[in-house]
Amino acid sequence: MCVLFFVVSGYAGTERGQSLRVALIQAHLQWGDVDGNLKAFGERVERCGEADVIVFPELFASGCEMKKGGGDKKAEIAARYGDIREKLKEWAVNKKAVVMGSTIFAEGDRYYNRLIAAFPDGKCLYYDKHNCFKKGAFSPGEGQLIFDYKGFKIATYICYDLRFAEWSRNTTGYDVAVYVANWPASRREDWQKLLRERAKENKAHVIGVNCAGTDPDGLYYAGDSGIVGTDGEWIDRCDEGKDEIKVVRIYKN
């Protein structure tokens, strides 16, 4: 497989410290309700304190199953892409932090699950999910996103990417890998195990941020958001099923 990396080095900041404060937002999502989710995440962001990086779950403005409650809502959610991106930029500027989460992006007749990383200067970088769980639901992206921020090289991934060790192989020397997800509780043991494996095999901190609660079809999400150290052991974790914000300081090896 030929892997294209988008490695960006222009966001190192003015001070290259050896620690990074990461806010994990494990949230109950309002499925299909963009306005409700944007309002709720705006309130959550205000409670993050002095974080350097703020991480939301996958598809934070809508939830992941676009057919829940009847009808496919991908086009409806994709039409709000500009509003969602502007909110991420606003929060990043106001909090002086990198704020990241994924949403639906449309290009022609193709839909992508796009992670947006918004920076304090108002600029954004993007990663389109490569390993898609359901064929046809989203088109796969072709490249990876790895960027420097405050002395840390950070790689970004989305949910099902976690199962593919080669896709996140640390060939670029990243310090932190971020996985945003809507990962159901029925496979929570896999989520916990794979986060630890990716950290240990790549000798990098791994951040996993999942949604929590129950969706309209009764599918339960345990959350299990947390940060794993380079030794494969948990540094800190959110409580099961809880709408919770946890700010954790990690140190560069």
Stretches with model-predicted labels:
Residues E15-R47, V53, L59-C64:
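N-terminal, active-site-proximal structural segment of metallo-dependent hydrolase catalytic domains
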Residues E15-V22, I146-A155, V176:
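Beta-strand-turn-beta hairpins that frame and shape the catalytic cleft
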Residues R21, M100, R114, K123, ...:
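Conserved beta-strand and immediately adjacent loop positions that scaffold enzyme active sites
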Residues A79, A106-T172, S186-K193, V247, ...:
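Active-site catalytic loop in hydrolytic enzyme cores
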Residues Y81-A97, R163-I245:
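CN hydrolase (nitrilase-like) catalytic-core segments centered on the catalytic cysteine
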